[in-house]
Amino acid sequence: MPIRAGSLLIPDSDLSIAFIKSGGPGGQNVNKVSSAVQLRFDLEGCALLDERVKARLRRLAGRRLTDEGAVLLIARGERSQEQNRRDAEARLAALIEAALVEP
């Protein structure tokens, strides 16, 4: 599902989602269900963003930027995959929107 960030629509081809097991509270279910979400955004491969926006996004991403040039967000605060996916997508959209603002 594409992610809307301001006036941009980030296509699925620039995103990948993996579901992983989440630790912490949640009862026995937490050890059986992969409810945490890893959302990866291919920043370097994204054709929608110009180089200035990419540079700002690299700065904003900080340690969430991988060596391959992808932004990696992990959401594990909720008990369901769907809620964690929405959280990760909202955080990515907020990062991109912040990078779109020229200083």
Language-model segments: which ranges?
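Ribosome-associated translation termination/rescue signal centered on the conserved GGQ peptidyl-tRNA hydrolysis loop
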Residues: M1-P103
